[in-house]
């Protein structure tokens, strides 16, 4: 029996919608990264973009455990002298709630062109509404802890 190797033209993509209300950031991000990469499919191939589209709603209601909402920091630099910026999780979730989840998922995907293509299939919305009803997304229930 020959080993099956999936081709890019044979990929079947589904659309999933995930409600982030009261979900822990890291645990939800790992499940989203798995869906985006296609690792949940028996036809997974690390060099083919075989993942599904993921829509996340209620990103503003995502949570962290412990004291991390006050202590977790996000850093960036403008490459100019004195251009170092730091913002806490609490400040970032207040201004741009979708960026928190995008940063977490981005760190779990490959740092290549393939990873950027997979991240483009992630659609995050702060509130409960999304404009992707025409794609008929399936409701994805994140795995329970334990």
From Swiss-Prot:
The cross-references to InterPro entries, in alphabetical order and at most eight, read: Ribosomal_uL13, Ribosomal_uL13_bac-type, Ribosomal_uL13_CS, Ribosomal_uL13_sf
Residues covered by region (Disordered): 126-146
Record has Ribonucleoprotein as a keyword: yes
Molecular function as annotated in GO: mRNA binding; structural constituent of ribosome
For this protein, the record's PROSITE patterns field holds: RIBOSOMAL_L13
The record's section on SUPFAM superfamilies has: Ribosomal protein L13
- What would be one Pfam family of this protein? Ribosomal_L13
**One GO CC term, this protein:** cytosolic large ribosomal subunit
Q: Name one GO biological process term.
A: translation
Keywords per UniProt: Ribonucleoprotein, Ribosomal protein
Q: Which family does it belong to?
A: Belongs to the universal ribosomal protein uL13 family.
SUBUNIT field: Part of the 50S ribosomal subunit.
PANTHER family the UniProt entry points to: LARGE RIBOSOMAL SUBUNIT PROTEIN UL13M, RIBOSOMAL PROTEIN L13
Function (record text): This protein is one of the early assembly proteins of the 50S ribosomal subunit, although it is not seen to bind rRNA by itself. It is important during the early stages of 50S assembly.
What this protein is called in its record is Large ribosomal subunit protein uL13
Species of origin reads Roseiflexus castenholzii (strain DSM 13941 / HLO8)
Species lineage, top-down? Bacteria, Bacillati, Chloroflexota, Chloroflexia, Chloroflexales
Q: Which gene produces this protein?
A: rplM
């Amino acid at each position: 029996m020959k080993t099956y190797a999936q081709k890019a033209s044979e990929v079947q993509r589904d659309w999933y919608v995930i409600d982030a209300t009261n979900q822990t950031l890291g645990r939800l991000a790992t499940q989203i990264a798995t869906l985006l990469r296609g690792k949940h499919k028996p036809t997974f191939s690390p060099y083919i973009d075989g993942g599904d589209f993921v829509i996340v709603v209620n990103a503003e209601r995502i949570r962290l455990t412990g004291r991390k909402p006050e202590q977790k920091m996000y850093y960036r630099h403008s490459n100019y002298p004195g251009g170092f910026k730091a913002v806490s999780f609490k400040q970032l979730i207040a201004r741009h709630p979708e960026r928190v989840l995008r940063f977490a998922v981005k760190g779990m995907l490959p740092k290549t062109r393939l990873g950027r293509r997979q991240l483009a299939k992630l659609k995050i919305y702060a509130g409960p509404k999304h404009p992707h009803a025409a794609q008929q997304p399936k409701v994805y229930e994140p795995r329970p802890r334990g």
